[in-house]
Amino acid sequence: MGICPLVPDVYTMNKEENMLFVADYLKGIAAITMANKEVHWLSFPKGVSAKGIDGLVYHNNSLFAIQNGVAPIRIVELMLNKANNQLVDFKVKDNNRPEFDEPAMGTISNGSFYFFANAPWKAYDRNGVLDESKVANPVLYSLKLK
């Protein structure tokens, strides 16, 4: 399918559960139609990068993406068309906070988007071994949604 198999936590489904969205850290977001397993890559609106997504959640016809692989690090709302097969607009929800040290993994509950502000990616060496002395306590953030 051409989708990065190494990032299994960066996917979400639409409300009808007929479309799966999978983020690839370098390529962007693939939309997979569940009925026929057809894969197509979403085109991003001008002004927003497709790269560096390390968290993805579907909510009210939008994808909320955590982008820790771009500068500035940010949380972006990517608005979908009604068919959920094209990105039509975007809005930066939060960015450039000094507390954002590799934000990752999010969920939406009770009208807020929750995510970790400090995933421990920098605590791993080149061989994938975790240096526990470099791991900070998790910091959970929330953004109130409309």
What are these regions (language model features)?
Residues 24-25, 68-70, 80, 118-120:
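Short loop/turn segments immediately following the C-termini of beta-strands
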Residues 29-31, 36-54:
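Anionic-ligand binding region
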Residues 17, 26-28, 36, 70-72, ...:
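Surface-exposed loop/turn positions within WD40 beta-propeller blades
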Residues 118-137:
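Short, conserved, GDST-rich strand-edge loop motifs in beta-rich repeat architectures
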Residues 28-30, 71-75, 122-123, 140:
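Structural signal for beta-propeller blades
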Residues 1-19, 23, 47-67, 98-110:
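Beta-rich, blade/repeat-based domains predominating
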Residues 33-37, 79-84, 144-146:
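Short loop/turn segments that connect beta-strands within beta-propeller blades
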Residues 1-2, 38-46, 88-96:
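A short beta-strand motif characteristic of beta-propeller blades
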